[in-house]
Regions:
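Glycine-anchored helix-breaking recognition loops at helix->coil/strand junctions
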Residues: 272, 291-295
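A general structural signal for well-ordered secondary-structure junctions
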Residues: 41, 221, 293-294
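Polyanion-binding catalytic cores of nucleic-acid enzymes and NTP/SAM-utilizing transferases
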Residues: 111-275
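Short, solvent-exposed loop/turn segments at secondary-structure junctions
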Residues: 21-23, 70, 175-178, 194, ...
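Signature of N6-adenine DNA methyltransferases within the class I
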Residues: 1-157, 161, 198, 261-273, ...
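Alpha-helix boundary recognition
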Residues: 35-36, 172, 216, 288-289
Length: 295
């Protein structure tokens, strides 16, 4: 987008068909801010989950912007029909004028929906102002070594019962369902790097000879990885490791309709999940899984 913007003449226009993830995802904040501050977004068409383009493997959108000041009057629509005879006619009949003025999620709403949204925001409390924390799952840098199946877990514990102290169940993004999860019998060797703020020392792998023997099979890869701890045997720093032991909400990072599950068993998650800790997490789980939240 920025490269195209750079070669535009003043008031020149650019139209792209791309993935629509930038419209709402956190990683799209800087791009949304760029559009709002540097361009005039004239037309935005979100195809949502409808596969209009045969060669596209992702949900798509069309954005047309001009190289001029944002007039704060974007003609936008969401395509809700799977089969379109004439996109131009559909756009003229269903588009609405919307202001996109900052990095907040770009959500296309009808005039009635915009009024409802404004009314809710006027009396409600934004999620960011609730007493919660949101964290990413555990990054190992080399899952093949640190994430093991149940058979390997049993072997390590049989060889050295002390191994059980740092082996914990782990969920992946694909395991998360609405109000539940499908445990794939995967386990994390949690050789964490300590939590300095809490006075927790890093795991000394020499205290766990069976696990060290297992990890030594992958030592060249462990040594090369960028996100390691004090030693190649340790995971990278994770200041919120204790939060995985608290009551929390787990949800995957890449699905169209996010499922949420409440956990109080101390499950760990991989990098394909996020967790939410804090107050009212049971209530929030129910709300996040509701049709009201999806609306």
């Amino acid at each position: 987008y920025e490269l195209g913007y750079d070669i535009l003449k003043p008031k020149g226009t650019l139209t792209y068909i791309t993935s629509n993830k930038w419209m709402r995802a956190a990683y799209g904040e800087s791009l949304r801010n760029f559009f709002a501050e540097k361009t005039n977004p004239d037309i935005l068409i979100d195809f949502s989950g409808n596969q209009i383009f045969d060669t596209a493997t992702v949900d798509t959108n069309i954005l047309m912007f001009s190289k001029e000041e944002n007039k704060q009057e974007t003609h936008a629509c969401v395509v809700k029909e799977k089969l379109l005879i004439n996109l131009g006619d559909y756009f003229r009949q269903n588009s609405t004028k919307t202001k996109f003025i900052n990095k907040d999620s770009w959500v296309i709403l009808s005039e009635i929906e915009q009024r409802i949204k404004a009314k809710v925001e006027a009396v409600g409390t934004p999620l960011k102002d609730w007493d919660i924390n949101i964290y990413r799952g555990v990054l190992t840098g080399y899952n093949e070594a640190f994430i093991i199946d149940g058979k390997k877990k049993d072997e390590l514990i049989a060889e050295d019962p002390k191994s059980a102290e740092i082996i914990r169940p782990i969920l992946r993004g694909r395991d998360i369902k609405k109000y539940s999860y499908e445990f794939a019998d995967l386990w994390l060797i949690n050789s964490h790097n300590g939590i300095k703020e809490n006075g927790v020392k890093p795991i000394n792998i020499d205290d766990y000879p069976a696990i060290k023997k297992h990890l030594n099979l992958f030592y060249p890869q462990l040594e090369k990885r960028a996100d390691k701890g004090d030693t190649p045997y340790n995971l990278r720093n994770c200041a919120y490791m204790d939060d995985f032991s608290k009551q929390k909400i787990i949800y995957p990072n890449m699905t169209k309709f996010l499922p949420f599950v409440f956990d109080e068993k101390g499950l760990l998650t991989n990098q394909k999940c996020f967790i939410i800790t804090g107050k009212h997490v049971e209530y929030l789980t129910a709300f996040f899984n509701s049709s009201l939240f999806k609306y």
